[in-house]
Each structure stands twice: as structure tokens, then as C-alpha cells.
Amino acid sequence: MTGWDPAQYLKFAQPRLRPALELLARVQLDAPAVVYELGCGTGALTTIMAERWPGAVVTGVDDSSDMLQRAVPSAPNARWQRKDIATWAPEAAADLIYSNAALHWLPDHGQLLRRLIGYLAPGGVLAVQMPRNFSAPSHVAIAEAARDGPWWARIEPLLHESPVAEPRWYLDLLSSLCASVDLWQTEYFQILSGENPVKEWTKGTWLQPLLAALAEPARTEFEEAYARRVARAYPPRADGTTVLPFLRLFFIASRAPLPVPATTLRRAGRAGRAGGA
């Protein structure tokens, strides 16, 4: 996806960062040598990974030049690649491929995940988080506003069904490809501030390509049509804040490590017997 607005996206930096950190905390790798973050955005997580594993070559990958301009100064010990993650391939087999809130932009997850797992070194890990809120009022209102205006012909080709499958589908696929799979869902009740904050949240992600497809005045009129609907769906609380429930899917899939050579096992066994004599 192109046309990202870093300032709009970062209006809600903390609630967007929380699931990314929770995914990273579940990655159990002591000293990976090659680490990639796909869809690194402004590089917040790439920076954290470079600090966690200072001996690794950590590379952030994104196709947005605007996002990467923000990322480059943030982690001088990280590398950056401007590439489309739909066609990306690593320069070396990866010990960790990490992706937070990016793969749902891509189709055909069966083919995609097979390809990414194929890029892992033995014992390597694929760690992914994707939103699963596409049937929520925040997204239903997008489709409703799109159909209710002269902009429909421009927007219709950009609308599609939920890109993220049911959790069991991912569990079955990943279990057939990997030695171990850890999969879970979390629903976050995000407390947002500001005027119509759910509209502002969505404008930083899912709404962005639709707005980019329209010229004025249609762009503003479509945004206003969506804003009215989403404001009704998410009214403010008595204290002025707004609650946005948000469901997210996580998984960590690990390839089997290389088998220990039989000669190594025999040597270890002889050493153990000698030590006990």
C-alpha cells in the first residue's frame, strides 16, 4: 500500500504499539543473526529489535518512503529497505521474520505464509499480528458510506472481503508447515480521546487508500459521510473518551531446528560416561 501519512498514523501511536510489543515479547530467540520486520512503518519496533539483539543484522522493510524517512534516524544500527512486502525476498535465510499489522493488506495468505516460512533458517520464527475487526462498525460504516454517494464507482474496486481468515485456518496451515505454532486472539478495549476519534483512527489505515482515490470535493464529502456514521456507532462516554473494541490475531510459527548429528550425540554420551567413572 502507498500513500501512508505518518502523522495521521502516529496520532494513536501507543495503542498501535501495544500489540506489537506483546507479540515481540512472546518471541523466544536468544541470539538471532538475521532479523526482518515486514511493514516496519516508522521503525519503532525495528529499533527495539536492534536494541534487544545487538549482534543481529536487523532490517526494516516497507514500501512507503514517507514512513521510512521517519524510520531511518531512529535506529542507526538497523538497516532499511524500501520494498513491496508482497514480492519481498530476504538476502539471507532469516532467524526471525516479524510483521505487525501489515500482512492483512496482502491477498492469498496460504501462498504468502508458505513463502515466508520458506525464507526461514532451520529453527527460525515467523511472528505475525493482524487485525480481525473487519466486521466491526468502524469498517461496516466504510462500505455503507462508499455505496451512498457518487464516489461509488471509484471506491468499489478498492473494497474487498475480510482479508484475514478464521484462526483455525491459520492453525491448520501453519501446523502443516512448522514444528510448533502458538496462536491466540486478544480484544483490546482502546480508550481514545478527541473529536470522533474512531474516524481519525481509521483514517490512518483502512480509510486512507479510499480517500487517496478521490479528488476534491468528493474526498471531503466521502470522509464526512463516513464520519457521521462512525460517530453514531461509537458515541463518546460521559468523560468525553470513546471506546474502540479491537480484535487482533497473533501467531508465532517456528521451523524445526537442524537435527544434531549422531556423531555429536555419541561423543556427548562418551563424555558423560567418562565423567561419571
What residue ranges belong to the model's regions?
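Class I SAM-dependent methyltransferase Rossmann-like catalytic core
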Residues: 2-14
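Conserved alpha-helix/loop element of class I SAM-dependent methyltransferases that forms part
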Residues: 14-33, 48
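Class I SAM-dependent methyltransferase SAM/SAH-binding core
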Residues: 34-88
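Conserved Class I S-adenosyl-L-methionine
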Residues: 42-44, 163-261, 265-270
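A conserved beta-strand element that flanks and buttresses the S-adenosyl-L-methionine
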Residues: 98
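Short catalytic micro-motifs in class I SAM-dependent methyltransferases
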Residues: 101-102
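Helix-to-beta-strand junctions that scaffold the AdoMet/dcAdoMet cofactor pocket
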Residues: 106-107, 120-122
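Conserved catalytic/acceptor-binding region of the Class I
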Residues: 110, 117, 125-193
